[in-house]
Amino acid sequence: MLVITPTAENVTESPNARMTGLAAPSRGSTELSTWTVAMEAGRSGPEHSVSREQVWTVTSGVLEVTCGGRTEKIAAGQTLVLPPDVLRRVHAPQKAEAHVAMRADGVVRVPGTEETRELPWAR
């Protein structure tokens, strides 16, 4: 058994959100990564795809998620399953937080580029 306590070194700030890494291979998990996402009202992440399925559970506020051309509002207490390799964008119409889980080997791709990018908070 392993207990993980978030620290400042596990936090990644972007212009759109704050990601706090929890379970990940760098912190003792072998298969899964989990993290929290905190977004201020009006912020949106970039359109991108992820190579692995992700499970988002909104813990406060509301998120609007567009995936594969369909938009859903996800409120606190609801869970959204995002399929792999489908374009998505996450928007916070109000301040929101979510807990995310994914296989640890997932990578991100942005439309119009061939390169993939690792998620540092999930490694």
Predicted features along the sequence, with ranges:
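A short, N-terminal "cap"/entry segment at the start of jelly-roll beta-barrel domains
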Residues: M1-E31, P111-R123
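Ligand-binding loop in jelly-roll beta-barrel domains
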Residues: G28, K73-A76, P84-R109
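Conserved short histidine dyad/triad with adjacent acidic residue
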Residues: S33-V50
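A short beta-strand-loop-beta hairpin characteristic of the jelly-roll/cupin
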Residues: S49-A76
